[in-house]
C-alpha cells in the first residue's frame, strides 16, 4: 500500500492498516512496552573473584533474563592469587602455549562458578602479541574445547597487552538456560 508523505507524494511504501495511523501508534506502543518489560526483567551482575582486579574492571558479567549471558573480561596468564591493588604477575613468561592453557583453566573455573562450561561459549576473541603464536593457541584451544562445540572466534594480533609479559588474552561470552 502506498502512504503519502507530508507533501502529498506517494513515494513512501509502508505497511498500512485500514484503521490508519492509530493502528501504527498502538503497535509501536506495544513494542515499546514489551522492550521495557524485557529490560526490567534483566538482572546484570558483576564479579571479581581475583582480588587484584577489584575496582579495575569486572572479570565476569552475567545478564539473566530468558537465559543468562556470561561475559568474561580478557583472561590471560595473570596470577589470580595476586593481592588487591597489585599488578598481577604473569605465569609462564615467554611461553604462549602454557599461557593459553593457564588462561583456559581460569576460563573454565570462571564459567563453572556461574553454571556454565566451554560448551556454553558462543563467542570468543583471542588477542595475541605475535602472529607466530597462532599454532600454539590453535592447539591449546582444540585441547580446551575437546570434542565439544566451538564458539564463533576472532583472532587478533595486537602490539601489547595490559601487563608486560602477557602474550595472549581471551574474551569469552557464554549463554546458559535460566
Spans of model-derived segments:
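N-terminal polybasic/positive-inside topogenic patches
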Residues: 14-21
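N-terminal presequence-like segments and the immediate start of the first folded domain
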Residues: 23-105, 109-123, 129-178
Amino acid at each position: 500500500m502506498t502512504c503519502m508523505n507530508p507533501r502529498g507524494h506517494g513515494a513512501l511504501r509502508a505497511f498500512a492498516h485500514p484503521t490508519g495511523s492509530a493502528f501504527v501508534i498502538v503497535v509501536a506502543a506495544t513494542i515499546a512496552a514489551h522492550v521495557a518489560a524485557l529490560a526490567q526483567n534483566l538482572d546484570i551482575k558483576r564479579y571479581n573473584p581475583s582480588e587484584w582486579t577489584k575496582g579495575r574492571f569486572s572479570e565476569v558479567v552475567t545478564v539473566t533474563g530468558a537465559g543468562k549471558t556470561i561475559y568474561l573480561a580478557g583472561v590471560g596468564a595473570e596470577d589470580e592469587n595476586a593481592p588487591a591493588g597489585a599488578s598481577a604477575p604473569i605465569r609462564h613468561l615467554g611461553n604462549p602455549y602454557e599461557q593459553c592453557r593457564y588462561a583456559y583453566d581460569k576460563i573454565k573455573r570462571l564459567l563453572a562458578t556461574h553454571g556454565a562450561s566451554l560448551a556454553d561459549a558462543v563467542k570468543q576473541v583471542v588477542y595475541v602479541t605475535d602472529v607466530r603464536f597462532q599454532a600454539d593457541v590453535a592447539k591449546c584451544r582444540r585441547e580446551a574445547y575437546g570434542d565439544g562445540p566451538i564458539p564463533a572466534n576472532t583472532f587478533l594480533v595486537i602490539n601489547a597487552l595490559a601487563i608486560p609479559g602477557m602474550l595472549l588474552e581471551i574474551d569469552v561470552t557464554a549463554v546458559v538456560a535460566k
